[in-house]
Amino acid sequence: MSSDAIRNTEQINAAIKIIENKTERPQSSTTPIDSKASTVAAANSTATETSRDLTQYTLDDGRVVSTNRRIMNKVPAITSHVPTDEELFQPNGIPRHEFLRDHFKREGKLSAAQAARIVTLATELFSKEPNLISVPAPITVCGDIHGQYFDLLKLFEVGGDPATTSYLFLGDYVDRGSFSFECLIYLYSLKLNFNDHFWLLRGNHECKHLTSYFTFKNEMLHKYNLDIYEKCCESFNNLPLAALMNGQYLCVHGGISPELNSLQDINNLNRFREIPSHGLMCDLLWADPIEEYDEVLDKDLTEEDIVNSKTMVPHHGKMAPSRDMFVPNSVRGCSYAFTYRAACHFLQETGLLSIIRAHEAQDAGYRMYKNTKTLGFPSLLTLFSAPNYLDTYNNKAAILKYENNVMNIRQFNMTPHPYWLPDFMDVFTWSLPFVGEKVTEMLVAILNICTEDELENDTPVIEELVGTDKKLPQAGKSEATPQPATSASPKHASILDDEHRRKALRNKILAVAKVSRMYSVLREETNKVQFLKDHNSGVLPRGALSNGVKGLDEALSTFERARKHDLINEKLPPSLDELKNENKKYYEKVWQKVHEHDAKNDSK
């Protein structure tokens, strides 16, 4: 046994014997209790348990509530009903989209077989569509949804009934939000019902790589099973990549590519696969305009310059994208960021009017970029249809209604939705670090009933004190009341003499203490999940302007601050092996913090 272990054992032995010989301490005087709190305590007192109405309970604020009814009765109750096939499907096998909409609104679930059936039907339908679909006007174009089901319902209220309104969605239906499955299945059911005027494109999040890294896979494992998740990923591989709207607009999730010279290049792709990390397919789903897209860098750019621009130029003996048109996309970690010159060149070559895309959160829900020189029309338009993205951005959502050659942008705000804990944890899993930490604090408090002075090695030998009426110092006091040796019962004496029990007790307490310190670290990490939500107050901290860059960052708008902190999640996630290494490093870091905490305490 190490010297530290021996010392700790001796201290625990001394503490146990001192506790055995202490007199019962007088109860400390209590402070006056607030009259209102006294009333509440009296109302809930167990003294009147026999006559108490157990169907009524008095809260701390004095309100009396019923114990057999929901307190928040204004919030619709979650339905536990799993629909039958007759309720869910029409005689022709197509799902009843109105029933599904209302069922999901009450957080209802489907059976695994029903979910698989809808996904399989949608996959078969997508597989028959070309990479580049043609959609006529009038039409309503929508951007990212990201699992915000209740906002999706609001979108249809603003945009019009899907039964009578044509829709084109630009991808990113899943991840980040807590209702990705509901969004996906409801959109798939609308596609199955209205195939002639309802279209869905693929976004960069519609792939196994991103959904495994973000929230969709965890959601599917929590709500259903791995088989349904795999079927959803298969359906993603069948989604079309782009749309030609009214023969004038290229609609795509991400942007253009140096490899995109004609629209036929899109149809030449093999899309039935996982999204690659480079190439034309990657760029269509991942590309962004550069940050300086609207800045007047091309004021002298002529139509001839645009026509003569080259997307690919010789570089070190091989062809590479022109730096005037495409630069590596450092924000995403893959694909390219394209310039105004690149967009104008593409529109000139294809004869199109503009590019409509999604992929980036916008404070107003949309952004129109610099006009083309030839037609004076916005060369690029970004749409984002997830309001208050991540419950943090405080942004508006927008959709585009296009009819009779007129564009009409409609904005809407977020809709309240049910709350889920991060990673779909239940309340017990969420609270375990807190409970573990508090339990160990209680154990430590029990051990700390004796002062350090009482446990010092130079304290009179405990064996000499047992059986005498010698005064023992009380914890936190210079004197102690005498305690007759006869107060110790034979049972207690036998326990105190059991060396193995004392050592086992000590080892258990130290082990729990170490686990508790790990819980403490994990609790801090758990709290960081809510870090972005702390930025929602909108209040500038005192002294922010005097704190340099950090203070100025805090003075930014809610949207900009949230976007800045969430920027790391806009990148292409690491591979599975890289993720395993990151998790390994994370837990090594947790244990390192625990060991550092131990070393710090030992040095005191």
Swiss-Prot record:
The signal peptide here is: none
Any Gene Ontology CC annotation: cytoplasm
- Determine if RNA-binding is one of this entry's keywords: no
UniProt biased composition (Polar residues) = 480-489
Q: What does this protein need as cofactor?
A: Fe(3+); Zn(2+)
Q: Which UniProt keywords apply?
A: Calmodulin-binding, Hydrolase, Iron, Metal-binding, Phosphoprotein, Protein phosphatase, Zinc
Which residues make up the binding site for Fe cation? 144, 146, 172
Q: Where do the segments described as Disordered lie?
A: 21-48, 470-497
Q: Which Pfam families does the entry mention?
A: Metallophos
The record's GO molecular-function terms, alphabetically, read: calmodulin binding; calmodulin-dependent protein phosphatase activity; metal ion binding
Q: Where Phosphothreonine occurs along the chain?
A: 31
Where Zn(2+) binds, per the record, is at 172, 204, 253, 359
Q: Which reaction does it catalyse?
A: O-phospho-L-seryl-[protein] + H2O = L-seryl-[protein] + phosphate; O-phospho-L-threonyl-[protein] + H2O = L-threonyl-[protein] + phosphate
GO annotation terms (biological process):
calcineurin-mediated signaling; cellular response to pheromone; conjugation with cellular fusion; fungal-type cell wall organization; intracellular monoatomic ion homeostasis; positive regulation of DNA-templated transcription; regulation of cell morphogenesis
Q: Transmembrane region positions?
A: none
Residues at the catalytic site:
205 (proton donor)
Segments for region (Calmodulin-binding): 501-523
Q: Which residues are annotated with the PTM Phosphoserine?
A: 489, 520
Cofactor: how bound: Binds 1 Fe(3+) ion per subunit. Binds 1 zinc ion per subunit.
User: What is noted besides the main data?
Assistant: Present with 7110 molecules/cell in log phase SD medium.
Q: How does it assemble?
A: Composed of two components (A and B), the A component is the catalytic subunit and the B component confers calcium sensitivity.
Into which family does the record put it? Belongs to the PPP phosphatase family. PP-2B subfamily.
Q: Which named protein is this?
A: Serine/threonine-protein phosphatase 2B catalytic subunit A2
Gene giving rise to this polypeptide? CMP2
